[in-house]
């Protein structure tokens, strides 16, 4: 007696419906909600259905899954954002992704089936974002005021990169067979003017800061080119003959979604943490020279550890520091359109003005769009770095400590 051939796991059955269509169903891995999933293929001719079934099984064997119409872009983006991305992506970066996912990707493409997403849809995402008023109050209005500012290509670029990252995972899992983002040119990030204080203005500011109780905080920004969180998170035990900028203060709303290998320390205050820079290349150690050496020694005093700069004994809120910086500039009689991050650009310009080589500037301030970041990062360059910082101090002249 001839033994009837058996079907392999997941290969499903072949049957003919009442309307004459030949169909087969292939069992797949459970869906994002844990429910059963099947790929159903129907053709008018049995041979066509058999051919389609064979191709589908080959795809299943190759990719481990088959696309179905049950997963929408909205469902996949939420799954990626909540269950996949947090394993690799830092909380602050993830928060930016969440904003663009909920604000743009889902409203524009969310109802599309994931496996039906095309290059044209990605272009639609770009175009829709760049035709959206920057002012939320104007969105949805048909007749916009003349000169209404729209969202820049930078927003479109962030949306493109976020969608592409989520689709790469979908491609790897076999839920789609190509990433449509790869077929479309990425939006070009808009070049914005990077305003900075010039040498006379920097001197004017430092002289003004000498009389302020919080002057050491703002002077440290100008004299180091450090990032906002690096100075707010500076601790006394990381100040010697050098300044160790290997931690930064950040506000993290949901630390439970942090990657397992991410280093952080909780600080007093709601959602405030000390975190490591994105990569070890960002752990900078710069020499202390005058007047910064005296400024910091007076600030630290006999303090052995803990944050150097606090507000009413508590860690600074990063956003509060940004707002207070503007008030400092106004009080000093200086333009208030140089943002706190612009103090980095001021430091870069001062170092250039002092004749410091570009490679040394990059080692002092870290990656900056105002200077070229070299691929190497020497740790044995202490003398050159100290000379560079001294040149900048000489350029600024004698500033009261």
List each model region and its residues:
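Short, Arg/Lys-rich segments that mark the N-terminal edge of DNA/RNA- and chromatin-recognition modules
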Residues: 1-42, 92, 253-268
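C-terminal secondary-structure termini that scaffold catalytic or DNA-interacting sites
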Residues: 1-4, 249-283, 292, 311, ...
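N-terminal DNA-binding module of tyrosine recombinases/phage integrases
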Residues: 17-124, 299-302, 308, 314, ...
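N-terminal core-binding DNA-recognition domain of tyrosine site-specific recombinases/integrases
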Residues: 41, 46, 66-70, 74, ...
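Catalytic-site neighborhood detector that most strongly recognizes the C-terminal catalytic loop/helix
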Residues: 44, 188, 249-251, 293, ...
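Major-groove DNA-contacting interfaces characterized by cationic-aromatic clusters
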Residues: 65, 69-71, 75-76, 115, ...
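Short, basic (Lys/Arg/His-rich) helix/loop patches that form interaction surfaces
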Residues: 134-135, 206-214, 224, 286, ...
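Basic, Lys/Arg- and aromatic-enriched nucleic-acid-binding interface segment
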Residues: 135-161, 172, 176-234, 251, ...
């Amino acid at each position: 007696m001839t033994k009837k051939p058996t079907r392999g796991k997941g290969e499903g059955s072949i049957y003919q419906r009442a309307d004459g269509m030949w169909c087969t169903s292939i069992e797949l891995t459970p869906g994002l909600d844990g429910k059963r999933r099947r790929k159903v293929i129907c053709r008018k001719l049995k041979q066509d259905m058999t051919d389609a079934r064979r191709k589908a099984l080959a795809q299943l064997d190759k990719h481990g899954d088959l696309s179905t119409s049950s997963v929408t872009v909205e469902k996949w983006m939420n799954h990626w954002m909540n269950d996949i991305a947090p394993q690799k992506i830092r909380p602050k970066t993830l928060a930016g992704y969440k904003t663009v996912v909920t604000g743009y990707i889902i409203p524009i493409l969310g109802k599309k089936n994931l496996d039906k997403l095309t290059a044209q849809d990605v272009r639609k995402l770009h175009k829709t974002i760049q035709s959206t008023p920057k002012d939320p109050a104007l969105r949805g209005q048909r007749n916009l005021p003349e000169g209404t500012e729209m969202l820049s290509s930078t927003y479109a670029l962030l949306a493109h990169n976020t969608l592409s990252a989520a689709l790469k995972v979908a491609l790897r899992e076999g839920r789609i067979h190509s990433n449509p983002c790869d077929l479309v040119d990425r939006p070009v990030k808009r070049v914005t003017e990077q305003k900075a204080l010039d040498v006379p203005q920097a001197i004017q500011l430092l002289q003004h800061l000498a009389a302020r109780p919080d002057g050491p905080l703002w002077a440290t920004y100008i004299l180091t080119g450090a990032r906002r969180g690096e100075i707010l998170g500076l601790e006394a035990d990381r100040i010697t003959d050098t300044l160790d900028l290997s931690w930064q203060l950040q506000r993290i709303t949901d630390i439970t979604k942090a990657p397992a290998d991410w280093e952080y320390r909780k600080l007093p205050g709601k959602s405030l943490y000390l975190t490591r820079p994105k990569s070890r290349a960002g752990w900078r150690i710069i020499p202390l020279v005058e007047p910064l050496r005296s400024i910091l020694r007076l600030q630290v005093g006999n303090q052995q550890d803990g944050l150097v700069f606090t507000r009413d004994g508590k860690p600074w809120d990063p956003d509060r520091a940004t707002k207070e910086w503007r008030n400092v500039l106004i009080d000093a009689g200086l333009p208030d359109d140089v943002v706190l991050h612009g103090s980095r650009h001021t430091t870069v310009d001062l170092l250039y003005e002092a004749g410091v080589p570009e490679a040394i500037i990059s080692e002092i301030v870290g990656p900056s769009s105002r200077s070229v970041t070299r691929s190497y990062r020497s740790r044995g360059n202490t003398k050159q770095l100290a000379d560079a910082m001294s040149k900048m101090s000489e350029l600024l002249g004698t500033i009261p400590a």
